[in-house]
């Protein structure tokens, strides 16, 4: 009866877990990548052609709960910003540990490198949601860091809502906006005997549909040299996973390793997005096989004494209490280290 009286509101169960049949929409953690080492971006070759379609309920709108949660290295310069009763003791411990290990001068580089990885993961996760036709929306855990619960540095902004220096609003809004160009690319790492293939889509949740929009695309080198360009005419209704057109381009003219960028946008607007991909020669050069060892035995030292390079893989040799139990994956820590250990 209350719902019938208040028609300008939607009702759902507590966020993240329970499904209640009389909810207006289902807010669930199911359509998100998550922190497992067997997630799509940890076990798959780099690509952008996947979505959450198999997890979408047909009987009720779904909104994904707390997607992202990708952690970044702490910005130790933030310590001085805590001028009141609250002190960043956790950051002070991180700083002491870094200095004790002789890496005190690497703090800013660790922040930037991990921040760029975090940005890539957020781009991947948000675009996966926007490619999913019928998904009602998504909730990020947060745009800024949460300093509690074991230190959850999941934000692209710090705890003071300030820029941390590795991504700006212009780049972030390319893939998180009311209108977002999308591309389903089956391979981001290719050889020059293949074709670059991409199915172009859009997510559009603007005030009204866009009629007769001109969608422009281009392929450029890392230095900005234009390789190929084109356009599509289409209408963009309200929704996600809106199909626009397809691109195919042969790569046989690239004889050396080359980074390419596919850009897609709407003509005469700020709406744009981009994806990097890499092309390598299909013909592999013969190189001398380098020694690989799992133990520093006499044979390994013999190779080293002869001036050879030896790759030492110590997996399974490090004691658990020294870090041997830590599983390594492409993605950064999900939510926080304490939660995952």
Descriptions of predicted regions:
Residues 82-341:
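Carbohydrate-binding surfaces of carbohydrate-active enzymes
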Residues 1-3, 7-157:
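Substrate-binding/catalytic cleft of secreted carbohydrate-active enzymes
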């Amino acid at each position: 009866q209350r719902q019938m009286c208040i028609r300008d509101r939607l009702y759902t169960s507590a966020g993240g877990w329970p499904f209640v049949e009389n909810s207006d929409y289902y807010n669930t953690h199911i359509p998100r990548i998550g922190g497992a080492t067997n997630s799509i971006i940890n076990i798959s070759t780099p690509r952008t052609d996947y979505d959450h379609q198999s997890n979408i309920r047909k009987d009720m709108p779904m909104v994904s709960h707390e997607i992202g949660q990708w952690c970044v290295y702490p910005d130790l310069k933030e310590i001085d910003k805590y001028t009141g009763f609250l002190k960043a003791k956790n950051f002070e411990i991180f700083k002491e540990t870094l200095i004790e290990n002789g890496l005190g001068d690497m703090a800013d580089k660790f922040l930037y490198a991990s921040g760029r990885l975090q940005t890539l993961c957020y781009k991947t996760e948000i675009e996966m949601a926007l490619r999913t036709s019928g998904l009602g929306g998504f909730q990020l855990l947060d745009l800024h860091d949460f300093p509690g619960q074991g230190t959850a540095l999941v934000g692209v902004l710090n705890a003071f809502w300030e820029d941390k220096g590795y991504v700006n609003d212009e780049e972030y809004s390319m893939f998180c906006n009311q209108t977002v160009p999308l591309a389903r690319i089956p391979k981001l790492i290719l050889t020059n005997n293949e074709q670059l293939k991409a199915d172009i889509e859009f997510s559009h949740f603007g005030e009204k549909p866009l009629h007769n929009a001109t969608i422009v695309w281009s392929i450029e080198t890392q230095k900005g040299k234009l390789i190929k360009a084109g356009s599509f005419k289409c209408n963009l209704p309200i929704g996600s996973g809106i199909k626009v057109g397809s691109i195919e381009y042969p790569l046989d003219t690239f004889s050396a390793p080359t980074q390419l960028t596919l850009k897609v946008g709407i003509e005469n607007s700020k709406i744009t997005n981009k994806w990097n991909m890499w092309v390598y020669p299909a013909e592999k050069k013969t190189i001398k096989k380098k020694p690989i060892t799992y133990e520093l035995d006499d044979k390994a030292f013999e190779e080293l004494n002869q001036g050879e390079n030896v790759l030492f893989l110590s997996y399974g040799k490090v004691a658990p209490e020294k870090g041997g139990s830590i599983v390594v994956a492409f993605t950064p820590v999900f939510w926080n280290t304490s939660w995952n250990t």
